[in-house]
Amino acid sequence: MLVPLMEAVTDTCGGKAGALGALLRAGLPVPDGFVVPFAAYLDAVRDPDLARSAGESDDLDAARRMIEARPVRAAVIDALGRALDELGDPPVAVRSSAADEDTGQASAAGQHESFLAVHGVSEVADAVRACWASLFSPRAIDYRGACGRDGRPSDDPVMAVIVQRHLDAEVSGVMFTPAGPDGATEIEASWGLGPSVVGGTVTPDAYRVAEDGSVTRTVADKRTRLDRHGTQLVIRDVPTRARERPAIDDATATRLAELGKEIAAAFGGPQDIEWAIVDGRVWILQARPVTAALPPPSSPSTASDTPAATLTGTPGSRGTVTGTARIVRGPGDFARVHPGDILVCPFTDPAWTPLLRIAAGVVTETGGVLSHAAIVAREHAIPAVLGIPNATSRLHDDTVITIDGTIGTVTAANA
C-alpha cells in the first residue's frame, strides 16, 4: 500500500516523490522515508458518497471540506504505523506530491500543504489527509486554472504524499543550477528550517558560483529563523552577532554548486533544488525543473541615474510596469486589490497566489529571488522587486508607481 521512497516513481507517486526516489537510487543524500501513493488517494475519494457529491457539484471548496471530514481508512493508518516504526518513529516531514507538481511546465511552488515536525501515526494520518484536501484549496485551484487545468476529486488531479525523517537544519536554502554551460549556480541560504527561505519571510544571503568556481555573495540581515521545538515550529530572533554573518562559507557554496550540477546532469536540465545542512552534511529535500528564467544579474544603480524617490531591492521577476500601489498586509486586504494593481506587502504567502493572477506586479519587504512567490511571479510573467525594507510604510495606497523587476527598482510617478 505504501511505497519506499527509494522506489518512488512519478507515474504512481507524483513529481516530487519521483525525483527524490531517483536521487536516492543515484546514491545522493536524501532523507529516508516512504510515499502514500496516488492509489490511496484515489481509494479515499472514490468513496461512493464522496464521489457522488463531488460529481454533482462544481463547488471544489466543498470537495475539500468533504475530504477533510473523512477519516483516513484503517488500512492506511495501519500501514503508516508499520512504516513509521521501521523508521524508528522519529518526527517526520509530510509533504505533497501531486501529479502535476514539480513538472517542467509548472512548479506548483507552495500551492499544496506540507507539514514539518509531525510525530505519531494519528498526527501523520491527519497531515496526509490535509495534503489530499489541499488539492482543492483556493490557491491550488487558482494555480491550476492559470495553467489551464481544473479537476474534481472523482476525476483529476491526484495527490501522493511523502513522509520523510524531519531534519533539524542549522542552515537551509534553495539553489538554481545553471541554465547554460557558462552559467552560474544561484544559491540562497538562511539560518534554521527551509520555509523561511522558500516562504519569503526572511531575506536570505545570496551566492553566485561561477563556472570557474569563483564565488560572489551578498550577506543579508537575517533577523528571524524557524526551528523545531518538540512537535511545534517556532520563530526565533537571530542573535545580533549572527544576523549579518554568512550562513554558509564559500567552500560550502562551491560544494552545493557541484552537487547541483550532478543533480542537473541526472535529470537532463536546470534544477530548482531545496537543501538543508545538519551537522555539516548537505541533504537534498527537493529537486524540480526550473520553470521560468531568473532576471539577469543587474549592475548597481548610481546616484546620477536613479531618481531620488526610487527604492532599490532585489530583481525577482523581469519586466517593467506602472500601476496603482496597493498595500496588502494580510488576507483582510485581499478584497481591496483590483486588476492591474501593484501589490506592496511584507512578504507573499502561497495562499496569496490568486492575487498574482490579477496583479500587475509585486513589491515585498523580505524574500529572495528563489522563493516560492518569486517563482510563481515569473511563471505568471509579472514583474517583482523583493526585499525593500519597510516598503509598506515607504509606499502608499493609491499612488502610481513604476517597478522594474529586471534591475530591482520602484519609483513613484512624481519622482
Regions found by a protein language model. Give the residues of each.
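N-terminal beta-alpha lobe that positions the nucleotide/phosphoryl donor
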Residues: M1-I162, E170-V171, A251, A264, ...
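Conserved metal-phosphate-binding beta-hairpin within the catalytic cores
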Residues: G110, A265-T291
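Conserved catalytic alpha/beta cores of large enzymes that bind or transform nucleotide phosphates
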Residues: A189-P270
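Acidic, glycine-rich flexible loop/linker segments
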Residues: V197, P289-A292, T320-D341, P346-A415
